[in-house]
Amino acid sequence: QALVATISAFILKGVIPAEPAVAAKSGGRSLKEIVRQPGFLKTVFSGAVAYMVMNFLMTAAPLSMHMHGISQQASNLGIQWHVIAMYGPGFFTGRLINRFGALRISATGLLITAGSVLAGLCGTDIFHYWLSLILLGVGWNFGFTGASAKIIDYHRPEEKTQVQSLNDFVVFGVMIVGSFSSGALLNLYGWNAVLWGSLIPVGIAFLCILKRSHKTVVVKHE
């Protein structure tokens, strides 16, 4: 914990938050019109899935480790590496998005998340949990950041507030559902059921991205 705190303090040293820009209060399309754009809902859905599955598995993993006789210390360390994996790639995720595109990075994140599930299905040793959690963190970073970056293509500056508010509402609403349901599913059916259950939304979200990968929707910022 001390090492993580020290690294965080070093990174944030001297960082001064910029003054928030004042969004335009006039003009812009209705939220209904924005939502009806081809691909918008699929983009929101893929971002919500990336966040929900991350929280779903992260919540259940420590409980499952305890159920399989793994120490609390090992469980805590696994979560710490998971958090590092979540935010560590943030130093270069933006560059990857600029180079390869938001959709590709989001799809890559979902594939890494699927890899996290497969790692968990391989066994219940410490290594399996840690590998699963680390992959889960990286998958979340790519999947959620890519989807969030793609959302920008669907709104103009004066529409930013309402679009981001809707996106956040959906993402965090779904995340809460996943967080509360993971413990119950783990208790009733076990760790493997939690893992298999995670693959379904990940697969659907990945297919949604594949269908959008050959189309580009760009809003002209007039």
Region spans (language model):
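Short amphipathic helix-loop junctions that connect adjacent transmembrane helices
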Residues: 59-78
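Pair of pore-lining "gating" transmembrane helices in MFS-fold secondary transporters
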Residues: 36-57, 134
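Intracellular juxtamembrane helix-capping segments at the cytosolic ends
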Residues: 142-156
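Structural signature of the two symmetry-related core transmembrane helices
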Residues: 104-119, 199
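Juxtamembrane intracellular "pre-TM" segments in multi-pass secondary transporters
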Residues: 14-44
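C-terminal membrane-cytosol helix-exit motif in multi-pass small-molecule transporters
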Residues: 1-20, 208-213
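A late C-terminal transmembrane helix in Major Facilitator Superfamily
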Residues: 159-188
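Helix-to-loop junctions at the C-terminal end of transmembrane segments
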Residues: 89-102, 186
